[in-house]
Amino acid sequence: MKELTCFKAYDIRGQLGSELDNEIAYRIGRSYGQFLKSENDADKTVVVGGDVRLTSEALKQALANGLMDAGINVIDIGVTGTEEIYFATFYLGVDGGIEVTASHNPMDYNGMKLVREGSKPISGDTGLREIQALAEKNEFMDVEVKGNYKKVSLLPEYVDHLISYITPAKIKPMKLVINSGNGAAGHVIDELEKRFIELSIPLEIIKVHHEEDGNFPNGIPNPLLPECRADTANAVKEHKADMGIAFDGDFDRCFLFDENGDFIEGYYIVGLLAEAFLQKEQGAKIIHDPRLSWNTIDVVTKSGGVPVMSKTGHAFIKERMRKEDAIYGGEMSAHHYFRDFGYCDSGMIPWLLITELLSLAPDISLSKLISAKRFLFPCSGEINFKVKQAKLIMEQVYLHYYENSIHFSAIDGISLEFEGWRFNLRDSNTEPLLRLNVESKQNIALMNDKVEELTKLIKKLDI
């Protein structure tokens, strides 16, 4: 029985040929179908979609064949971003959904993201290990009645849902640069543009790298990397736009640029979105991760909301949101989660909400909004250290700082707070890395000093 190394902690990702091919995709379909059928033998339906990668369509069809051979009905919604699968799964009330995507991974990779009913995530401890075991064993139960297959477009319904997050009459005239990175976002932007015209929403869109093209002629879209930001930034400056928006390949993350073309750290976007929601629903709960938190806590508290800290990672955030009935959850990594979107992440909802937030304060630019937050709570951004013994170093760092700290949390790694500054240090689930985030209160020099101090200590301990 050969191990399938494409199964990761939270999803499926692998190099084409050696780790993932059509035959393995078929087995994953059979396995997921058998996994669903093991709960009860009622009719089951799964939604499938795929991004623009050149191999996604063939993998999706193999996956669909596996599902149907397991007795599962398949609804194929075509070329999609991951969030379109999330939407289709909860909107149609079906039993699960699978998106074929490798997001921002290299060209020779592909993968899958799986959810079950209500778009609840399937990851290591919620079914993915069982599906992996079935796929590796490759011995499937006989099925008397195969599932059926149909193609459906839900784009109009999905765009209706996106528009529901804003009040069209409140939107002021604005010029937006949108860089789809030749990924799956293009068709959604086109449909949104039509809807803006129909509803007299005065948003002008300048499109960059718009055509969906699995060859990715302008490089793999991953705006988290500084080298992937120039085209968006330059277009914002050239067209004198009010905001720039850039997506990764399956557009589950969006990255924002102010009117000067400057990239905005995801941390500060969490605060903006929290404020936008608390203007709509006073007293709501907002979930945030512990890596950087002071700005979010400050905004939420001042806006009359309740900040709730959760461990980093989509499965943890979604679970905590459901438990708390939180309206919104945000991570500094540009993942934003919404209660009314099945507690799932969306890359489209954030920028729509921020256009409304800017419209409600028409004399304040995006750069002014963000610079005020950067001044109050300057942050380092995430700094990665490749180390030999991550957990041992974390323990030593904790012992070094704990005595002088005023607050400690182990929700995710170690978070220690002091007068005027704090840090979070956590190890990666998948790589031999330590990830450091430092922030301060109105003191950039202190923040930089502490980054240097912690960097020296971590390197000294890595022996």
Curated annotation (Swiss-Prot):
It is found in: Cell membrane. GO terms for molecular function: magnesium ion binding; phosphomannomutase activity. Keywords: Cell membrane, Isomerase, Lipopolysaccharide biosynthesis, Magnesium, Membrane, Metal-binding, Phosphoprotein. GO terms for cellular component: plasma membrane. InterPro entries: A-D-PHexomutase_a/b/a-I (IPR005844), A-D-PHexomutase_a/b/a-I/II/III (IPR016055), A-D-PHexomutase_a/b/a-II (IPR005845), A-D-PHexomutase_a/b/a-III (IPR005846), A-D-PHexomutase_C (IPR005843), A-D-PHexomutase_C_sf (IPR036900), A-D-PHexomutase_CS (IPR016066), Alpha-D-phosphohexomutase_SF (IPR005841). Pathway: Nucleotide-sugar biosynthesis; GDP-alpha-D-mannose biosynthesis; alpha-D-mannose 1-phosphate from D-fructose 6-phosphate: step 2/2; Bacterial outer membrane biogenesis; LPS O-antigen biosynthesis. The active site is at S103 (phosphoserine intermediate). CDD domains: PMM_PGM. Its EC number is 5.4.2.8. Binds 1 Mg(2+) ion per subunit. The keyword tRNA-binding does not apply. Mg(2+) binds at S103, D248, D250, D252. It catalyses: alpha-D-mannose 1-phosphate = D-mannose 6-phosphate. The keyword Mitochondrion does not apply. Its cofactor is Mg(2+). Its main location: membrane. It comes from the Bacteria. Signal peptide: none annotated. Involved in GDP-mannose biosynthesis which serves as the activated sugar nucleotide precursor for mannose residues in cell surface polysaccharides. Belongs to the phosphohexose mutase family. This is Phosphomannomutase. The lineage of its organism: Bacteria, Pseudomonadati, Pseudomonadota, Gammaproteobacteria, Vibrionales. The gene is rfbB.
